Structures are given as C-alpha cells and as structure tokens.
From Swiss-Prot:
Descriptive protein name: Probable galactose-1-phosphate uridylyltransferase
Catalytic activity: alpha-D-galactose 1-phosphate + UDP-alpha-D-glucose = alpha-D-glucose 1-phosphate + UDP-alpha-D-galactose
Annotated segments matching region Disordered: 33-57
InterPro entries, per database record: GalP_UDPtransf1, GalP_UDPtransf1_His-AS, GalP_Utransf_C, GalP_Utransf_N, HIT-like_sf
Keyword Repressor among UniProt keywords: no
Family: Belongs to the galactose-1-phosphate uridylyltransferase type 1 family.
Residues annotated as binding Zn(2+): 165
Domain of life: Eukaryota
Protein's organism: Caenorhabditis elegans
Active site: 167
UniProt cofactor(s): Zn(2+)
One protein family per Pfam: GalP_UDP_transf
C-alpha cells in the first residue's frame, strides 16, 4: 500500500485548520449510503399544486395558499427561526457562564421557479438573472434594518432540505452571527497587517498559481479554496473589490447569472445527479455597519457539497472532526482538476 503525506491547511477567513488526509479516500467503504438526489417529477401544474406545497397554488402546512406565481416567488417562512416580534424566554443574561439575549429578524423562502422539475442548473440564464435580482432587492429592503442578511440554499435531502422544489432561503437578524463575525474580524486584521483586502489578496495569488482555479469570466472567478473542508467545496469571487451584493453592477449581475448556471451544471455532472450542496452569500454586514468602514470585506459565494465518492456516498462528520479538528479525504487540487475538466452541457440533455 502506497503512503501519501498528510498535512494541515489554515483557513484565514475563519481562523481554523483542516487536515488533508488524501490516503483515506482509498479506504474500503461499507458505511451508510443515501439515495441519489433527483428533482420532483410531476406531469402538470395541477399535480404540482396538490403534491407540492411550494408549487404555484399549492397549500402549505400553515393552511396558506401560494399565489399562482409565474416567476421567482418570495414569502415569509411559516416556521421561522426569527420573527420581528420575538419574545425572549426570560430576561437577558450577561454572566460569564450564562449569556442570553433577545433575537429578532425575518425568515423568507425564495422559490426560484414555478416548475418543480427545474433547478438553478437547468433554468435558463434569463431565469437565473431574475433570482439574482430578487436577492438584490431583498438585500436592499432588509439591509438597513438588520445587521446580517443571509441568503442561502440547502439543496438535496442529504443536507436537510425538506422540499425538493427549487428554492432558497433568506434569514435576516438583528445581530451579527458567529461565522460572519469571525470573517469580519479576520478580514479586518488582515487589512490592518498587510494593507490589502484579504480575499482580493488571496484571489490575486490563486490566479498566479492557477491549480485551484476552475472557471473564470470577465467579472467572476470560481475556485476551490486552498483550505476547503467539504470534498467539492468551492468559492465564487468577484474579480474586483465588492463589499456587498448590492454593490454589484448590472453587467456583473448578468455575468453572475451566466457563471452561476455553468458551475451548477458542472456540479450536477460530477456524479450525474442533482448535486446536493449548501450555498451561501457572505458580504460586509449591514444595519449599523452601513455607517462603518467595512472596506476590508470582499463579497463571496460559498458552496459546501457533501458528496465524496459517488452520488450515494456523502462525507460524514465523524468523531475526530466533531471533537478535535476538521479533515478532508480529497485534496483541493484534485477536486479543482475534476471540476475543471467536467463538461458544461448538463448530463440530462445527453440522456434525451
């Protein structure tokens, strides 16, 4: 059995380390498998509304019926983690060992398309652009009121998605959550030490190295981070300095719709399935931070896909990762090479 050197890599964005143990990818697997991820298959909009509570005209478990929407549709989450009228379960506490404070916010669901069989990968570019414009609109509306606006998507049952209709979510909160706070502090420290925006500095160096770059266009670069934890984890970065999503120009948003669709097609083609992932935008915080200098921030979109060996074998968080330190089996460079070489035509078209 050949031995390969394992090593650790540092993630400066969240001040954490990850072990890269490439020899573990070859270990025999007799563990759990998941079902291959697919989209909902229905034959008509009428059937969709009956079977799928997120479809146009569908009735959700709250008893509220959706509009008969024909494009991207946004509604308040029926089971929100935050509300604007949150009542704290007891008073705030500031003891060193017992801290509690009130949280307020809003949670929304963003249905990308009325057709339950489509995803961002299989929608056309014009339809993806509509989703991007909705994201921008929501940031503009909620940013002045809330400290953090998190737009994200859980795609696939393996990452906890409760409905396979193409949709994402938005949670806006009156405080800066833990991971965004880490990113805020790390990027600020990097700027104070080096006089450079961390992720712009990083992108410049990755562009020279090339080995983890997957795809570029005039305005965006898609790459596997040097410190990636998830098997096919990637990051999408603007090629210029952009603090927040709302700072993107019209041409950049159009360019985003094109590269976003292309990269999601590549993801689906890895194992010829509806590739599951967790996707989320990060940019400079909002609310009271809008009056502060956040020029050290760089907007970025992260993808955390769990699949590792096949369409049915994901990465599982195991004991060492939970109790000690994160670890990955596939090197970021191999993941980048795999994604770079994959076709940009969706696999489903070859099956027709």
């Amino acid at each position: 059995m050949s031995k390969q050197n394992n090593f650790r890599r540092y993630n400066p964005l969240i001040d954490e380390w990850v072990i890269v143990a490439v020899n573990r990818i070859n270990r025999p697997w007799q563990g759990a498998k998941t079902e291959k991820s697919t989209t909902i298959s229905t034959s008509s909009n009428t059937e969709q509304s009956i079977l799928n509570p997120l479809a146009p005209g569908g009735t959700r478990s709250s008893g509220i019926a959706n509009e008969n929407y024909v494009s991207t549709y946004v509604f308040d989450n029926d089971f929100p983690s935050f509300t604007e009228f949150e009542e704290c379960a007891g008073k705030d506490e500031n003891d060193d060992l017992f801290k509690q404070h009130e949280v307020k916010g809003v949670c929304k669901v963003i249905c990308y398309h009325p057709n339950s069989q489509l995803t961002l990968a299989t929608m056309d570019v014009k339809e993806v652009r509509v989703v991007i414009d909705i994201w921008n609109q929501q940031y503009l509306e909620l940013g002045p009121k809330y400290e953090w606006v998190q737009i994200f998507e859980n795609r696939g049952a393996v990452v906890g998605c409760s409905n396979m209709h193409p949709h994402g979510q938005l949670w806006a909160s009156n405080y800066l959550p833990t991971l965004p706070m880490k990113k805020h502090e790390s990027q600020k420290k990097h700027f104070e030490k080096h006089g450079k925006v961390m992720l712009m500095d990083y992108l410049e160096q990755e562009t020279l190295k090339k080995e983890r770059i997957i795809m570029r266009n005039e305005h965006w670069t898609w790459l596997v981070p040097y410190w990636a934890f998830w098997p096919y984890e990637t990051m999408l970065l603007p090629n210029r300095h952009v603090e927040r999503f709302t700072d993107l120009g019209e041409v950049e948003k159009q360019s985003l719709s094109e590269i976003l669709r292309s990269l999601l097609i590549k993801y689906d083609n890895v194992f010829e399935c509806s590739f599951p992932y967790m996707m989320g935008w990060s940019g400079a915080p909002t609310g009271s931070f809008l009056t502060e200098n956040c020029s050290f921030w760089q907007l970025h979109l992260s993808f955390f896909p769990p699949l590792l060996r096949s369409a049915t074998v994901p990465k599982f968080l195991a004991g060492y990762e939970v109790f000690a330190e994160k670890q990955r089996d596939l090197s970021p460079e191999i993941a980048a090479k795999t994604l770079s070489e994959i076709d940009e035509e969706h696999y489903s078209k070859k099956l027709q």
